[in-house]
Structure formats: structure tokens, C-alpha cells
Design a protein with these regions (language model features):
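Glycine-rich nucleophile elbow surrounding the catalytic serine of serine-hydrolase chemistry
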Residues: 1-3
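Lipolytic serine-hydrolase domain surface
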Residues: 5-139
Length: 139
């Protein structure tokens, strides 16, 4: 991704992407806010989280806490954290955007963010606390 956004097509100051999605990212959670807050190529940065993600559980065995399955230290100023963990029909799922889970709120979220619209504003997510974390409530 870094090489792509450093290419000449991105040489202007405009933000070419409306939404950048870090979907259950298999990257270190610790200190993510420092590099996340420097991402300049999108209007909104979404980070999706499922603490029970079966793919990232395997990664946890050899790596520190992963951003995509950790609900701690969510302190990036730019990121919009979307926590799917306790939502209906989420379970241990990793690939929500395929639409095979039966949760209409998840489908609506991905339809919106993949078409340059705001995902955190849809009914079914609730913001809790001062951080920019939204929790999936149900179907």
C-alpha cells in the first residue's frame, strides 16, 4: 500500500480516497496510533475489530496483540474504530464483507464504506466513551 500511495498519481495534496479500511488488520496494535495518524490519503480511516477473529487468533500465537482483534488502546485521533465482536451472527468470522453472515447491519456498513459514504452513522452501531469507537449492537 505504501508504494502505491507514493506513486506519481498521488503527487497532489488531494485525498484520493474517501475511506480507507483496515479490515481486521494483522498488524501490531501497540503504537498503531503513531503511524495511523500520519496516513494522509483518505478522508476517513476505518479499523474493523472482532476480538474472536479465528484468523487473527492464529497470528496471536507468534505476534504481539493484533489491531484487528484487540479492543484496547484504541487511541488514534484519525481512526474510526468499528467493533463487531458482540454483534449478532459475528462469531469468529474474519471476512465480513462477503455478506455470508446474515447480519444486515454489517452488510449496510460495508455497502456504505465501500461506496465512499460514512459507515459509523448507520443505525445498529453505538459509540461508547470519548474515543472514536463504535460497537455493533445487533442485526
Amino acid at each position: 500500500v505504501e508504494q502505491f500511495v507514493r506513486s506519481p498519481v498521488f503527487s497532489s495534496d488531494t485525498r484520493i480516497f474517501d475511506n480507507i479500511i483496515f479490515h481486521q488488520a494483522d498488524v501490531d496494535n501497540q503504537r498503531h496510533k503513531f503511524w495511523m495518524d500520519r496516513v494522509q490519503y483518505g478522508r476517513r480511516l476505518y479499523i474493523t475489530i472482532n476480538e474472536n477473529d479465528r484468523v487473527l487468533k492464529g497470528s496471536d500465537l507468534i505476534n504481539p496483540a493484533r489491531l484487528g482483534n484487540t479492543s484496547e488502546d484504541l487511541t488514534s485521533k484519525r481512526a474510526i474504530y468499528m467493533d463487531f465482536t458482540d454483534g449478532d451472527d459475528v462469531g469468529r468470522e474474519h471476512n465480513f464483507f462477503t455478506g455470508d453472515h446474515g447480519n444486515k447491519t454489517i452488510e449496510q456498513f460495508f455497502q456504505r464504506v465501500l461506496t465512499s459514504r460514512r459507515g459509523e452513522l448507520i443505525q445498529g452501531f453505538q459509540k461508547q466513551g470519548q474515543n472514536n469507537v463504535f460497537y455493533l449492537q445487533g442485526k
